[in-house]
Design a protein with these regions (language model features):
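A flexible loop/linker signature enriched in serine peptidases of the S9 family
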Residues: 1-21, 25, 33-40, 48, ...
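A short helix->beta-strand "capping" segment at the edge of beta-propeller domains
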Residues: 123-133, 178
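Short amphipathic beta-strand segments in non-cytosolic proteins
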Residues: 71-73, 124-125
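Residue-level recognition of a conserved intra-blade site in WD40 beta-propeller repeats
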Residues: 43-44, 91, 142
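Tryptophan-centered short beta-strand motifs
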Residues: 31, 77, 126-129
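Juxtamembrane proline-rich low-complexity "stalk" or linker regions positioned immediately after a signal peptide
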Residues: 136-138
Length: 178
């Protein structure tokens, strides 16, 4: 979970020791701080690692968001991906895929851990990137087996299988749906 300072409508009184925390689900342990800053923490295939986002504002309306891989023992804090105008990242449970929102659209791409930061975006060309939505998409999340990505637009929920998105995925049809 993320502990942040108050502001606008909330009181800053309980905003000490802000950061990203983990807490065991047994209810008997106290929360442990794993990062000083970040948002949207999520687990993937390794329970000793969380992924979190950090946003850097470069102007009044310009920003860059990065996805970081952080070990729970705080021994590693590495940028995995970054993109201008990206508002959210979602790592698949198996850690092999990355979905992201850029300018209200939903995209998905492979996520190899290559030792350097991947630049993501609608026009990224280092790896294949596919747009999932027609008009817009938000609230990205993965199926438990990492084979489907879910997103919403207003009150509608959409699901896209990776086999219908990329031709190189095992089980993909010869001709992908449009």
């Amino acid at each position: 979970f993320v502990k942040s300072r108050g502001g606008y409508l909330t009181s800053p009184w309980h905003g000490m020791e802000t950061g990203v925390y983990v807490v065991p689900t047994d209810g008997k342990s106290i929360p442990r701080k794993v990062a000083d800053d970040g948002s949207a923490p999520q687990f993937a295939n390794d329970n000793d690692v969380i992924y979190l986002t950090r946003t850097k504002y470069t102007g009044e309306v310009d920003w860059s968001t990065s996805l970081f891989r952080v070990k729970l023992d705080r021994s590693e804090d590495v940028a995995i991906a970054k993109g201008d105008f990206v508002s959210a990242f979602s790592v698949s449970r198996d850690g092999k895929w990355l979905a992201f929102n850029e300018r209200f659209h939903a995209y998905v791409m492979p996520m190899p851990l290559v030792g350097k930061t991947l630049t993501v975006g609608a026009k990224a060309d280092a790896l294949p990137v596919k747009q999932l939505d027609v008009n817009a998409g938000d609230y990205l999340h993965w199926s438990g087996d990492s084979q489907k990505i879910h997103f919403s637009l207003g009150d509608e929920l959409f699901t896209t299988a990776l086999t219908n998105t990329f031709g190189f995925v095992a089980g993909a049809p010869k001709e992908l749906p449009k």
